[in-house]
């Protein structure tokens, strides 16, 4: 609502799609894409946690490239730089801004998105540098009023990502240092806000 109020104040036309649930579905993304095609935005602002940002990334892809085969984009591979399918270039129709309200997934600064096809039950992972948001606005004020349960879950998500990075086959001395420091930060500071006991 504060973002919409500011856009109104500036005289910027806008519309809002707020039907994204946790673990977003392809069907939900298609519904949001239909709204985009009707409104024709030149900027997409994704506000929320990882689910909202992932869904918005998928909507962005389908808005910019309606003819691309979704199953081709979601192929399995080990290295993001060694894809068989060439991911379509993004940003011709709309600029993408990510505004996180939780810090668990890091979707605002990663080239990944996950979406579930409700009809088949398949969870599609998409990974390509074209999915990187053009801008990320990370404002801690957006997170200070979050429920403790969400903050706990986000903190554990941060730790999980750090452990995955540390155990990755593609880990290096550089990434190990970042991963270990992320784990240390979770242990040092998560309990301060949540009163959660970490061993």
Segments and roles (model prediction):
Residues 3, 56-59, 186:
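Hydrophobic packing residues within well-ordered alpha-helices of enzyme cores
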Residues 27-140:
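Glycine/threonine-rich beta-strand-loop-alpha-helix active-site module
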Residues 112-199:
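Carboxylate- and glycine-rich phosphate/diphosphate-binding segment that chelates Mg2+/Mn2+
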Residues 1-43:
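ATP/NTP phosphate-donor binding region
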Residues 21-22, 104, 145:
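Short strand->helix junction
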Residues 2-9, 61, 112-115, 152-154:
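Short, solvent-exposed amphipathic alpha-helical segments in soluble enzyme
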């Amino acid at each position: 609502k504060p973002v919409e109020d500011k856009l109104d104040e500036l005289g910027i036309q806008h519309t809002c799609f707020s039907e994204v649930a946790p673990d977003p579905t392809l069907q939900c993304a298609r519904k949001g894409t239909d709204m985009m095609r009707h409104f024709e935005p030149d900027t997409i602002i994704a506000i929320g946690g990882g689910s909202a940002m992932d869904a918005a990334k998928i909507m962005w892809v389908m808005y910019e490239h309606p003819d691309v085969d979704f199953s081709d984009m979601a192929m399995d591979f080990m290295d993001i730089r060694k894809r068989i399918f060439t991911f379509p270039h993004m940003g011709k129709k709309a600029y993408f801004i990510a505004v996180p309200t939780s810090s668990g997934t890091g979707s605002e600064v990663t080239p990944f998105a996950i979406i579930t096809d409700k009809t088949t039950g398949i969870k599609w992972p998409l990974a390509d540098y074209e999915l990187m948001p053009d801008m990320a606005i990370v404002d801690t004020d957006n997170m200070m009023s979050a429920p403790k349960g969400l903050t706990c879950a986000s903190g554990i998500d941060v730790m999980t990502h750090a452990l995955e990075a540390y155990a990755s086959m593609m880990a290096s001395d550089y990434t190990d240092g970042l991963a270990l420091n992320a784990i240390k930060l979770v242990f040092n500071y998560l309990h301060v806000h949540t009163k959660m006991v970490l061993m």
